[in-house]
């Protein structure tokens, strides 16, 4: 009959004789129109065994509906929230979280038996019920095809736009192999190296009408599960479920019954599909923006996106609810299709239109991209992200650093006028909104090439100095977002001993190493050091948390054997390998060599190959109370003049990138340059000390 309906079961518990309201897509369980005796007499069953698999490469609603054999009208009912699906049909609710994510789905379908009620209308007596008398049903189930569906949904990690198509193609090729992959006796999946590499980055989600002992979550799990599906359906389809149903108009069996007056125009259905698909796509874009690591670190932008998500989700639910309310009325002939068109038109003319929301998300994504281009420069350095002014104050005031340098994103706004418009529109009837404000991007800071370039230049300068001050105990570097209308894009704040000194800090130009006169200028680069117990010679003792060393020629220390230990000379390295710019001070007394060395310096040679200053691995300033100060490298020695012979505090300044290590006599807040070695360093250097060489006494304290 032309008014018969054919539809997928979608995990709903259809039985022969069950009543159905096609206006509301609602099953009416607990009652059979024909009764058990009549059903028994006129029911026929025919085996209809088949199986197939199919690849679904798209995540669109249209592709999913096609995979589930859903016609346009039922599809709109599902999107509008009228149909509650179960079993394998829950696949319809599984959408990608991100736009930049590849998804490929393997569908397995098996059919087992076809059952039908064979008595024509008018030849059997039907049971009366208040359901039919009150017009609560329009159709009755007359045939059911049983079987089972299974969907293996494989998702890649979030990828860059440029890699999306390539990953998608490789995923399709790999997923197509699942039905043909063999599992050896060890139950391991045999894959090529390339397939293993791809599979390791895929996640799997299973939606099916099969009862599994455990759900597959990986590609390998999916392969193993797929192999078992034919047996899980049971002998003679014992475990199969309704897959497809045929429904006859109830009026054919009961003249008092209501009927479906009209189905919705296909073009109208497509417009509703498009509208709801657009909403889901916009939602995914917001999800993707929210998941950016940098967004999680910056509450100003995180809260803005979160606020949008809440408003937009409420709006989506409102649209779905309106569609769900109108569909039954249109199908019953109570309202015209124009009521559905009005939902589409209202959205197109509202602040929630696809054009306006897309424009706002474009601006958010641009803003995030600019922030990432700056923040990415300091990723992996010691610069610390703080979430707000309170946390920054805590770090600056309570922290141990004397100098705090802060890269501030100044133009990330807390209040967004467009979000206020969205909120007002959703909460109030459209007629009460005086005007519709579209999101503005023309004058937004992140679209200004000049502003962005200045931000990136400032970020690069900040990054360079973060690297220069690596391991400095007196300087801290921080990143955050604080609104400040005085500066577009970004600025650098400087705090000195807990107080804000300037909101527009410029790093001072460094003098030549000979030009340093004030100790405070070098203390910016001060770092903490400790002696390395694995390198210390057995004739040196350690104390004060490994910061004080003394020669012990009359008492051998019982250090454990270690390949890094110096054997032939009274020497020790520090634990810290240094690159960048660093300053440290020592108090020395007696016979001492102070400098730097590569970790690769020999340890056990009895000649001078392992002695500091006698090879290409080390650079030292030596103090001998009898003859004074000597700089030594590669066995070459030169006397060094000191302004006050016998001074007790020595400062060392390393500029690794510039290739220099400088020595200073320290007195109060003044330093006097003694000597600078110039070279090209090829690996990290370690503070190095020789304490009491050749049987002499010496002590040294790290400050």
From Swiss-Prot:
GO biological process: killing of cells of another organism
Predominant location: secreted
Native species: Synanceia horrida
Free-text description of this protein's post-translational modifications in UniProt: Intrachain disulfide bonds may be present in the heterodimer. Not glycosylated.
Residues covered by region (Structural MACPF/CDC pore-forming domain): 2-265
GO molecular function: potassium channel regulator activity; toxin activity
Pfam families per UniProt: MACPF_SNTX, PRY, SPRY, Stonustoxin_helical, Thioredoxin_11
CDD domains assigned to the protein according to its UniProt record, in alphabetical order: SPRY_PRY_SNTX
UniProt keyword annotations, A-Z: Cytolysis, Disulfide bond, Hemolysis, Hemostasis impairing toxin, Ion channel impairing toxin, Myotoxin, Neurotoxin, Platelet aggregation activating toxin, Potassium channel impairing toxin, Secreted, Toxin
Quaternary structure, from the entry: Heterodimer of alpha and beta subunits; non-covalently linked.
Name of the featured protein: Stonustoxin subunit alpha
Region feature Structural FAT domain, mapped onto this chain: 266-385
Protein family (similarity comment): Belongs to the SNTX/VTX toxin family.
Localization per record: Secreted
Residue stretches in coiled coil: none
Function: This lethal (towards mammals) heterodimer induces hemolytic activities due to its ability to form pores in the cell membrane. The pore may be composed of 10 SNTX-alpha/beta heterodimers. The toxin elicits potent hypotension which is endothelium-dependent and appears to be mediated by the nitric oxide pathway and activation of potassium channels. In addition, it displays edema-inducing activities, increases vascular permeability. It also shows myotoxic activities and interferes irreversibly with neuromuscular function.
InterPro entries reported in the protein's UniProt record: B30.2/SPRY, B30.2/SPRY_sf, Butyrophylin_SPRY, ConA-like_dom_sf, Cytolytic_pore-forming_toxin, PRY, SNTX_MACPF/CDC-like_dom, SPRY_dom
Domain B30.2/SPRY: 508-703
Expression sites (tissue/organ): Expressed by the venom gland.
Record's signal peptide: none
Annotated GO CC locations: extracellular region
Thioredoxin (THX) domain as annotated region, ranges: 386-517
Domain comment in the entry: The first domain (residues 2-265) is structurally homologous to the membrane attack complex-ferforin/cholesterol-dependent cytolysin (MACPF/CDC) pore-forming domain. It makes numerous contacts with the FAT domain and comprise essentially the core pore-forming machinery. The second domain is structurally homologous to the focal adhesion-targeting (FAT) domain (266-385). It makes numerous in cis contacts with the MACPF/CDC domain (first domain) and the thioredoxin (THX) domain (third domain) as well as extensive in trans interactions at the SNTX-alpha/beta interface.
SUPFAM superfamilies assigned to the protein according to its UniProt record, in alphabetical order: Concanavalin A-like lectins/glucanases
